[in-house]
Amino acid sequence: MTKTIPKIGSRKKVRIGLRRNARFSLRKSARRITKGVIHVQASFNNTIITVTDPQGRVVFWSSAGTCGFKSSRKASPYAGQRTAVDAIRTVGLQRAEVMVKGAGSGRDAALRAIAKSGVRLSCIRDVTPMPHNGCRPPKKRRL
């Protein structure tokens, strides 16, 4: 009879002291800047907020999904508000410009949250891309 050779690395690993659905933050801590640009991209499905320095280098970004919202709740105004608060608190901005893109429901809520956070806003720009009769839009959905 042959002896069975014990496996060195088994597939089952025992994790001590961990909850089953524990989430861990793998992000590095964001750089602290005093002046920057806040980009708000509000689509119909999500709200993404990116904070950059004046040269355009990304310092921190946040979205409704990374704040813990799932599926259709990512498109809500409350998700946009929480995303904006999360991004500004992490970076610690004092003065900023705001660039708003898109027509989603989180757009106005994110803008209100940025204004109430105590950041001095130098300008608010709407940079939503508007065609000057360029490409033909996709056909309308029929439900």
From Swiss-Prot:
GO MF annotation terms: rRNA binding; structural constituent of ribosome
Pfam families in the cross-refs: Ribosomal_S11
Keywords noted in UniProt: Chloroplast, Plastid, Ribonucleoprotein, Ribosomal protein, RNA-binding, rRNA-binding
Cellular localization per UniProt: Plastid, Chloroplast
GO biological process, one term: translation
GO cellular component: chloroplast; ribonucleoprotein complex; ribosome
Complexes and interactors: Part of the 30S ribosomal subunit.
Family: Belongs to the universal ribosomal protein uS11 family.
Protein name per UniProt: Small ribosomal subunit protein uS11c
Organism name: Cenchrus americanus
Phylogenetic lineage: Eukaryota, Viridiplantae, Streptophyta, Embryophyta, Tracheophyta
